[in-house]
């Protein structure tokens, strides 16, 4: 069974974007290729348990096990040696990606404190969108009592859109709450 947003994309988003931008082929219509969740954990150099807890949180949020990212080179000012674990990331594609996007837009974003919509300026010029989340407790899978610290994460949405205008129209069609 395909994810709800996957069906929604095929049945409603594609025709809407074809009409809006005048694409000649269905394959021209921009689509979301992947969503990457990244958690930078600079404070993990002192305590290895921080990485384990962050990996656990990301696993619950994404539904798949993240990869622990390691330092590419040593930085004496930050007391980091090469190969030290300094973060965790997970890449979602296909059905899991659509399920995450559905939960993110319909459940997690409305739970953000003082939420007035996401910025419409966080596109990179090539049709990809980045959003920072200040605390992981906005996701319903995370239980507030069981976390050791509030951690933020970066969510990158990679699309096949050629420019920011197409990408914004694509995410807008997925009911993304843009404020501007």
UniProtKB/Swiss-Prot annotation:
Keywords: Ribonucleoprotein, Ribosomal protein, RNA-binding, rRNA-binding, tRNA-binding. One of its GO terms (molecular function) is structural constituent of ribosome. Transmembrane segments: none annotated. Gene3D superfamilies: 3.30.1440.10. InterPro entries: Ribosomal_uL5, Ribosomal_uL5_bac-type, Ribosomal_uL5_C, Ribosomal_uL5_CS, Ribosomal_uL5_dom_sf, Ribosomal_uL5_N. One of its GO terms (cellular component) is ribonucleoprotein complex. The keyword RNA-binding applies. GO terms for biological process: translation. The keyword Ribosomal protein applies. Part of the 50S ribosomal subunit; part of the 5S rRNA/L5/L18/L25 subcomplex. Contacts the 5S rRNA and the P site tRNA. Forms a bridge to the 30S subunit in the 70S ribosome. Belongs to the universal ribosomal protein uL5 family. PANTHER family: 60S RIBOSOMAL PROTEIN L11-RELATED (PTHR11994). This is one of the proteins that bind and probably mediate the attachment of the 5S RNA into the large ribosomal subunit, where it forms part of the central protuberance. In the 70S ribosome it contacts protein S13 of the 30S subunit (bridge B1b), connecting the 2 subunits; this bridge is implicated in subunit movement. Contacts the P site tRNA; the 5S rRNA and some of its associated proteins might help stabilize positioning of ribosome-bound tRNAs. This is Large ribosomal subunit protein uL5. The lineage of its organism: Bacteria, Pseudomonadati, Pseudomonadota, Betaproteobacteria, Burkholderiales. The gene is rplE.
């Amino acid at each position: 069974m395909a994810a709800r947003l996957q069906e929604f994309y095929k049945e409603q988003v594609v025709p809407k974007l074809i009409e809006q931008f005048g694409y000649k082929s269905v394959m021209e219509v921009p689509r979301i290729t992947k969503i990457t969740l990244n958690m930078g954990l600079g404070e993990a150099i002192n305590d290895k348990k921080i990485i384990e807890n962050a990996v656990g949180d990301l696993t619950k949020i994404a539904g798949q096990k993240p990869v622990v990212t390691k330092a590419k080179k040593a930085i004496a000012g930050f007391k980091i040696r090469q190969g030290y674990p300094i973060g965790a990331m997970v890449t979602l594609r296909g059905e899991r990606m659509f399920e995450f996007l559905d939960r993110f837009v319909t459940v997690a974003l409305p739970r953000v404190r003082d939420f007035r919509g996401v910025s419409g300026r966080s596109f990179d010029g090539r049709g990809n969108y980045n959003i920072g989340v200040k605390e992981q407790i906005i996701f319903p899978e995370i239980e507030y009592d069981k976390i050791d610290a509030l951690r933020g994460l970066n969510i990158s949405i990679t699309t096949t859109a050629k420019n920011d205008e197409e990408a914004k129209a694509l995410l807008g069609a997925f009911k993304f709450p843009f404020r501007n």
